[in-house]
Amino acid sequence: LVADGRVTVLDNTNARYLSASMLPYMPDVIVCDASFISLQKLLPAALGLAKAGATLVALIKPQFQVGKGLVGKGGIVRNSALHQQVVTDVVWWLETDMRWHVLQTMRSPITGTDGNVEFLLLARKPE
């Protein structure tokens, strides 16, 4: 993947501080599998730099979205109501604050570390 000229590698870059000067062009696809930070804190800069019609594929990890007091032993969120609330909150944020259209969410067929339930999200930036 690194050898593909269409891919911009930004290793050791804090995505919260992405700027247009760091990218050779406006991205048309953003893929996010982040840990230890919520999507709401991590993605605004990248989403703002994306071109109209861009696609977002993100992994929602409830253990990094809920408050520390709601994460169980071993860093696992076991409450299915909390899972749904996290997905609802991320969708609301993307659609309301970021003005992206969420096309689909689904439970990831692959569990996270130690069985954490995670969710995939597909969204598109309006034309």
Where are these regions (language model features)?
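S-adenosyl-L-methionine
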Residues: 1-41
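Short, glycine-/aromatic-enriched active-site segment of Class I SAM-dependent methyltransferases
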Residues: 62-79
